[in-house]
Amino acid sequence: MTHIVLPQDILIRHIGERNITPYETLQQAADPSHCIHIAYIAEGYTEAEMPTFIKDCRIAMEALFAHEPFKSLRSRFNIVAVKAPSVDSGTSEPSKGIWKNTALHSHFDTFYSDRYLTTLHLKDLHDWLAGTPYEHIIVLVNTEKYGGGGILNSYNLSMAHHPQFKPVVVHEFGHSFAGLGDEYAYAKEEINMYPKDVEPWEPNLTTLVDFHNKWEGMIDKKTPLPTPEPTDLDKPNARRDKWKVGAYEPAGYAQHGVYRAYPDCRMRTNAHPEFCPACTQAITQLIKFYTEE
């Protein structure tokens, strides 16, 4: 799909290159004409804290490229760090009555969920990024509190100073970049997000209604569907080399009727070190879509 932009369009305001937010290039793609542009942007970092922001960006970047297929296709990414300064350090926590004056006005408690960290100020976000090379956005928030959020083709937002920063920022990028769904469910609360008679659009979830275009081709013919979880799942000494691609419950916030491809995945837990085969396949296809003619 192609969207044509005509620079001479009368509805396009020409502002030149003034007032561009300072940024640093963290990685240059091998071929700038066929690459994916990622911009990290600071949220809740004061001017004095920008060195910390750049350090956090490098940590997040290396965490992403520790995962396949990003690791093998790293040269196809161009990455910048955009230094958007905030008046206050940190982010807002409405449930505690804490409101901060920050570049993107981010806050926890989105939809009244304690750990759902987002911003609704998309115009501000893109104003800060104007004039910088970007397609996909990763917002790093200067907070120690656990939380984040990822919205497909919009942005990924993650806390930067919690011990689980690295797996969370990669997990959220799975949402915002590749449209991956969450592969977990809550034991005490089932969210009926996916009708059981409709195939989810997310490439790593299925209701088995229209499974043919997902990861069906990866499954051994002897593997039963649905597939029982291995008995060593979530145990320290799990024999992951014995795990198989299948259709496992729970997934997609539902205990039953929605399936994931593999026992564990970056889209299921923070403990698992990699994306599952279905997610890896989907991410690979998308990277090639962006970077190959």
Residues of each region from the PLM?
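Active-site recognition of the HExxH zinc-binding catalytic motif
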Residues: M61, K166-E183
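Solvent-exposed loop/turn segments at secondary-structure junctions
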Residues: G44-A48, P85-S89, T143-G148, P163-F165, ...
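Short pre-active-site segment immediately N-terminal to the catalytic Zn-binding motif
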Residues: M50-F53, G148-E172
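Extracellular/periplasmic catalytic domains that process cell-envelope and extracellular macromolecules
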Residues: A30-H34, K71-R74, L129-Y134, R239-R240, ...
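Catalytic zinc-binding patch centered on the HExxH motif and its immediate surroundings
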Residues: G90-E93, I98, L120-M159
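Propeptide-to-catalytic entry region of secreted or membrane-anchored zinc metalloproteases
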Residues: T2, P7-H126
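Extracytoplasmic/secreted proteins, especially bacterial periplasmic and envelope-associated proteins
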Residues: T52, D56-A60, D124, V168, ...
